[in-house]
From Swiss-Prot, chain B:
One GO term describing the cellular component: endoplasmic reticulum membrane
Role played: The small GTPases Rab are key regulators of intracellular membrane trafficking, from the formation of transport vesicles to their fusion with membranes. Rabs cycle between an inactive GDP-bound form and an active GTP-bound form that is able to recruit to membranes different set of downstream effectors directly responsible for vesicle formation, movement, tethering and fusion. That Rab is mainly involved in the biosynthetic transport of proteins from the Golgi to the plasma membrane. Regulates, for instance, SLC2A4/GLUT4 glucose transporter-enriched vesicles delivery to the plasma membrane. (Microbial infection) Upon Legionella pneumophila infection promotes endoplasmic reticulum recruitment and bacterial replication. Plays a role in remodeling the Legionella-containing vacuole (LCV) into an endoplasmic reticulum-like vacuole.
Location, primary (coarse class): membrane
Keyword Ubl conjugation: yes
Residue ranges annotated as motif Switch 1: 32-46
Organism: Homo sapiens
Membrane-related topology note: Lipid-anchor
Modification after translation (UniProt): Ubiquitinated upon Legionella pneumophila infection. Ubiquitination does not lead to proteasomal degradation.
Protein name: Ras-related protein Rab-10
GO terms assigned for molecular function: cadherin binding involved in cell-cell adhesion; G protein activity; GDP binding; GTP binding; myosin V binding
Domain notes: Switch 1, switch 2 and the interswitch regions are characteristic of Rab GTPases and mediate the interactions with Rab downstream effectors. The switch regions undergo conformational changes upon nucleotide binding which drives interaction with specific sets of effector proteins, with most effectors only binding to GTP-bound Rab.
Length: 222, 200
């Protein structure tokens, strides 16, 4: 009835204790000091008291009896205190264990990537402005943009030369570019006649001054 | 019948911290205009301006880089083809001045050894907000043996002078034998493989 509340792995020890009880009060003296209960201390005091009584009423025995009682009281206090402390710590441990499990479950549910490395970043997939493209893709796009820009500048320059009469029209032959002219025509079906003419001129001009154009192209940014 | 629209082609590069005004400096030079809205340059851009020096038509192909750290791997690959580099800081921004040594190190690491360098202290119209004295700019330029100008893209101070001086310095180093403009090889290399013309 005075047994301290034991659980789980301690149940075995409790059983052993019971066995000890079955072995009689003397069994308590054979127990490990770490498994002693106050019950055991009472058993021990019962055994010792019985033996002291058997020694008779010699005053030396009486004197010794006081000391033994004192020592047994100290043992009782220690065992009691120890068991209480163990029980308290056990409760505390179980409580913390439950709390950790709860937090862990909560954490994994909320953000599965809590354990990111120091050089990682989290991307919000619902953010319409989230990063999507790689540096290489940006590099490629920029290169293409700059290439097209430089080609446009070349074409504008050529056009300017043409407009200002530096290059006489119909110079040489643009026949080999006929296909491109057709393509240009098809792709600009909606544009008016004047625009078509400019495209035709441009293309034949590009062809005419091919070497010039190419030279500059090579000189252009890459 | 190739016509010649220029005698020489010089490739220049603008570098410096984000927001010091590299794009504005270039815009002032190429278009003689100024815009107060700040739009961070994405990676790299360029403009072309033809000038005449010592009777030669010189086409300046000026590369404008993004100052932001995140574009550095892209921008540094453009250093190598540059014949002249303008390093720009902002006289109202001490950090941009402190970073000059970092930019100079970048030049040492990525540009041609004989590249012509120039230091520009921009926004010199904002004297009330100045934190970098002109003398400090001059001093660091002297230490590195490079030219220095204080400029203002907004007030159009020293912009053309800076570009023309840099072009002259490059012209001075250019071999007397004038290269055929059609074959000027200024392909930047710079980690980016040159693309071949498909237009002809």
């Amino acid at each position: 009835m005075e047994e301290p509340p034991l659980r789980e792995e301690e149940e075995e020890e409790e059983d052993e204790g019971d066995e000890g009880d079955e072995a009689g009060p003397e069994g308590a003296l054979g127990k490990s000091p770490f498994q002693l209960t106050t019950e055991d201390v009472y058993d021990i005091s019962y055994v010792m008291g019985r033996e002291l009584m058997a020694l008779g009423s010699d005053p030396r025995v009486t004197q010794l009896q006081f000391k033994i009682v004192r020592v047994l009281e100290m043992l009782e206090t220690l065992v009691n205190e120890g068991n209480l402390t163990v029980e308290e710590l056990r409760m505390e441990r179980d409580h913390l264990r439950k709390e950790v499990e709860g937090l862990r479950r909560e954490g994994s549910a909320a953000s599965p990537e809590v354990n990111l490395g120091p050089d990682k970043m989290v991307i919000d997939l619902t953010d319409p402005n989230r990063p999507r493209f790689t540096l290489q893709e940006l590099r490629d796009v920029l290169q293409e943009r700059n290439k097209l820009k430089s080609q446009l500048l070349v074409v504008q320059e050529e056009l300017q030369c043409y407009k200002s009469g530096l290059i006489p029209p119909r110079e040489g032959s643009g026949r080999r570019r006929e296909k491109d002219v057709l393509v240009a025509r098809a792709s600009s079906a909606s544009s008016n006649k004047e625009e078509k003419t400019i495209i035709r001129k441009l293309i034949s001009e590009l062809h005419l001054h091919g070497s010039c154009c190419q030279g500059r192209e090579e000189g252009l940014p890459s | 019948m190739a016509k010649k629209t220029y005698d020489l082609l010089f490739k220049l590069l603008l570098i410096g911290d984000s927001g010091v005004g590299k794009t504005c400096v270039l815009f002032r030079f190429s278009d003689d205009a100024f815009n107060t809205t700040f739009i961070s340059t994405i990676g790299i851009d360029f403009k072309i301006k033809t000038v005449e020096l010592q009777g030669k038509k010189i086409k300046l192909q000026i590369w404008d880089t993004a100052g932001q750290e995140r574009f550095h791997t892209i921008t540094t690959s453009y250093y190598r083809g540059a014949m002249g580099i303008m390093l720009v800081y902002d006289i109202t921004n001490g950090k941009s001045f402190e970073n000059i040594s970092k930019w100079l190190r970048n030049i040492d690491e990525h540009a041609n050894e004989d590249v012509e360098r120039m230091l520009l202290g921009n926004k010199c119209d904002m004297d009330d907000k100045r934190v970098v004295p002109k003398g400090k700019g001059e001093q660091i330029a002297r230490e590195h043996g490079i030219r220095f100008f204080e400029t203002s893209a907004k007030a159009n101070i020293n912009i053309e002078k800076a570009f023309l001086t840099l072009a002259e310095d490059i012209l001075r180093k250019t071999p007397v034998k004038e290269p055929n403009s059609e074959n000027v090889d200024i392909s930047s290399g710079g980690g980016v493989t040159g693309w071949k013309s498909k237009c002809c």
